[in-house]
Every structure is written in C-alpha cells, then in structure tokens.
Amino acid sequence: YLQRLYSVVKEEDPAGLVTYVNYPTTEYLRLPFLDFACFNVYLESQDRFEAYLARLQNIVGDRPLLMSELGLDSLRNGEEGQAHSLEWQVRSALGGGCAGVFVFAWTDDWYRHGHDVEDWEFGLTRVDRTPKPALAAVETAFANVPFPAGLPWPRVSVVVCSYNGSRTIRDTLEGLARLRYPDYEVIVVDDGSRDSTAAIAKEYDCVLIRTENRGLSNARNTGLAKATGEIVAYIDDDAYPDPDWLTYLAATFLTTPHAGVGGPNLAPPGDGPIAECVARAPGGPLHVLLTDTVAEHIPGCNMAFRKAWLDVIGGFDPQFRTAGDDVDLCWRLQSRGWTLGFHPAAVVWHHRRNSLRTYWRQQIGYGRAGAMLELKWPEKYNGPGHVRWG
C-alpha cells in the first residue's frame, strides 16, 4: 500500500521527494523505495536518544534520516526542563548526522476534534504566543550546526595515495578543497604514476610527494611520515568527501577514545549502469560493525586514525601492495585493546568500477589480499577460508 502511494506521488511529481513518517514501534517496516527516512522520536534521556539515533541510522542505511518530531511537554517537565531537553535533542540529532529536525510544536494553542487540548504543553510559545525558554534554546541549537562553535578541533592530515589516478583524482582534490573544517592539510602521494596524476595535484593546495611504485601500504606510510596532524585521514583517489566529512570524523575523536573512525562510502549517482551493478555486488569496500557505533573494520577509502597510535604499531604492513592493508591495520589496532568508531554522516562518495574487466581485476586483487590476510591472521578465518567477523 505504501509503495503504491509512493508511485502515485512520483507520477504526479517525478522530481519530488517522498517519505513516510515512522515511529519506533514500527521501525521493522523496511521501505527502501523512499527517498529519505523520517521518524518521530520522544526520549527524555540523552544517552538513550543518541543510542537509538545510531540504531536508526543503521536501519535506514544509505538514505538521509530526518527527525520529523521531537519535543517535551513543559506542563509536566517545567519550562526550563523543556528548554534544556530540546537543546540537547536538536544538537544530538544534527551531531548524529540527521539531515534535519522538526520540533513539536510551535505553540501550546492546540486543537483536536474541535476542542482545545489543555493537558499538555509542547509548544515553543505559550497560548498567548509569548516565547518560552525553549524557543531561545532551540534557536541557539540550530545556529550551531552540526556542532557548537569553539570546539578544540584537532589538526587533520588528509592523505591521498594514487597510482595512475588522473581520471578521478581531480574530483578528490576539488572535494577536499571544499571541506568545511578549520585546520587540515592535504598530502598527495604519487606512487610512481605514469599518467598526469602529479600534474593535476600541482594545481591544488597540497603537499605532493612523488615516489617510485612501491605499493599502497608504502604510499600510506609515506603520507603518515609527512603528516603534521594529530589525526591522519585516508581517502582514495577515486572518491570525494562530503563537505562535513572531517567535521564528523573529528567530532567522534573528540568524544570517544577510539583509535580510528570511519564512515560510509556511497556510490555517486550518474556513473552508469555497470558501476551501479558493481555497487550492489558482493566484495565491495564495506564497513563491518560490532555495534551501531563501534566497528571491526573501516575501509581504506574512508578511514582516519590517531597518528600517535599508528606510529606505535608501525603504520601499514608493506606486504599489502594493493589491498588488505586496511583490514590488517584494523585488526592490529584491536589486538592491542583499542577500538574503532563509525559515524554515519562522515560520508565519502566512492566511484565503483565501471566495466566488468576492471571489476574482475579488482576482485582478483582482493582475493590475493584475502589469502595473505589468512596466512597472517589464521584465527580470523574458518575452515572454508571465510573471514569470521566479530
């Protein structure tokens, strides 16, 4: 029924965005045809609200999440209590990666079936439209999105390793130039390219390091050695970041003890039918979560680490020349008792292979890397040779 309604709307307005307002009690409804997801959530505990928000982000997957209702009744909680709660609700929702928030409601002047509603007061204003403290609190929260100004943002070094990446690296560097983050540098490691990768990199504000071709892990370590940031973030040369990518990664480092943090890598639209099929095929670069916010694996196209901890473990293992280095690094960090985090809004757009030939070649490389990982980490594999995640 809901899909039929969706189709009717799309017939009338093909460019319009369609959603369905859902509730926690019916979160089991999987509606992948919707353009974005909406939930009404009323929770008075900040910890529980943030935990449930993380759950919802994983339920909705690649689609934007909108908080279509949140609020608190001042009749039972007091006007100051309402103001305090609404401020953290808005901050938590936007800091947790929601695309937007609706606060319920504007005024206490409310009707139902032609009668005044007098047993609750959810409004930001009173019946006479005079503002309650919640109005100023919400205004303050919305004025500082996705995070309050003045946080002690760490310096971040973004490392881009490239081998013959001239076809896509310009998009990567353009995206990095548009980042909304106060303190970062870009380091491009040209791993012996024979195309125009280096010439393109020279057009941008970045540190360019040219080496002979020594493989991906060595290139990552070269960038690590040059990095001046407290955090080192890695993005592939066939990906480009959301403008707030570093902000969400860094915010997670500020609020958790994680050794590393990653986020989703989504296939950009318009890459063609083969790339779209590859994006849906098995064997892609996906994160592996242990909980809604803790990961076992964050893929190399979108990962960031505390530099000091990378230095402690000696960086990336050079034997992994094309793939597998990210998995090995994640396991080595966790073997020391450290954890990896995940933020659903730390998004990069990652081009998939757009031909069967390049996809097949990629999968061969992944297979070789998997065999190397099994030799190094036999306890991580079962009898048939499959990884036992978690």
Predicted feature residues:
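A conserved acidic beta->alpha catalytic loop
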Residues: 175, 190-199, 239
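Short aromatic/hydrophobic "clamp" motif used to bind/position activated sugar donors
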Residues: 232
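Aromatic-rich peripheral "rim/lid" segments of glycoside hydrolase catalytic domains that contact
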Residues: 104-152
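Conserved donor NDP-sugar-binding/catalytic core segment of glycosyltransferases
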Residues: 244-275, 339, 351
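Extracellular glycoside hydrolase catalytic/binding regions
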Residues: 2-94, 125
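Active-site-adjacent helix/loop segment of glycosyltransferases
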Residues: 105, 340-390
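Short, acidic, metal-binding catalytic loop of nucleotide-sugar glycosyltransferases
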Residues: 174-183
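Glycine-rich, basic loop-to-helix element that forms the pyrophosphate-binding segment
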Residues: 211-227, 289, 293, 301
